[in-house]
Design a protein with these regions (language model features):
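A short, polar/proline- and glycine-enriched secondary-structure boundary/capping micro-motif
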Residues: 96-100
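Short, structured surface segments that line ligand/substrate-binding pockets
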Residues: 66, 70-83, 88
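C-terminal partner/receptor-binding element of secreted or periplasmic proteins
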Residues: 101-148
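N-terminal export/targeting and maturation segments
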Residues: 2-69
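Short, surface-exposed beta-strand/loop "edge" segments at domain boundaries and coil↔beta transitions
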Residues: 55-56, 84-86, 139-141, 148
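A short acidic/small-residue loop/turn micro-motif
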Residues: 87-95
């Protein structure tokens, strides 16, 4: 029974959010994506955060019980009725040492915004992001910025 439940959860989230978004953005240099197009689970809000965010910041700001150590990552947390339903980290250190550029980052602030916040939340119907595909000497990397 436990193996069956694990298999269902693993199947449901078998491909990372990052991989799904990269696949969608792969043919374009810039597109608008809706986060709900990439999720197969219930959620009503997502929280996007940057590397200087502490777990306590998230708990206090959104009144949720969350105990994951965020470290120096970018990431996204999906919430449904104040419960975490899915989370994914985009490590700044997850890069090819020949490339030296993180492959994938979702920023909590708009592109070229003068005030760069540590985290931001987006209701499901407003979770739209501009996905920008950029070329480096050793391949491509992707940057997402909220448009709302």
């Amino acid at each position: 029974v436990i193996l069956s439940i694990f298999s269902i959860i693993n199947y449901r989230h078998s491909k990372s959010l990052k991989d799904k978004i990269i696949k969608k953005c792969n043919d374009d240099t810039e597109i608008i994506i809706h986060m709900s197009d990439f999720t197969g689970f219930e959620w009503d809000k997502c929280i996007v955060y940057g590397p200087s965010t502490q777990t306590k910041d998230i708990c206090d700001a959104f009144d949720i019980n969350y105990n994951t150590y965020l470290d120096l990552n970018y990431g996204i947390i999906f919430i449904d009725n104040n419960n975490v339903t899915y989370e994914e980290f985009f490590k700044v250190s997850d890069y090819d040492f020949t490339n030296k550029i993180p492959e994938f980052i979702i920023y909590p602030y708009r592109q070229n915004e003068s005030t760069q916040v540590k985290y931001a939340s987006f209701e499901k119907n407003e979770a739209e992001f501009k996905c920008i595909k950029k070329h480096s000497d050793n391949g491509y990397y992707y940057r997402l910025y909220p448009i709302n």
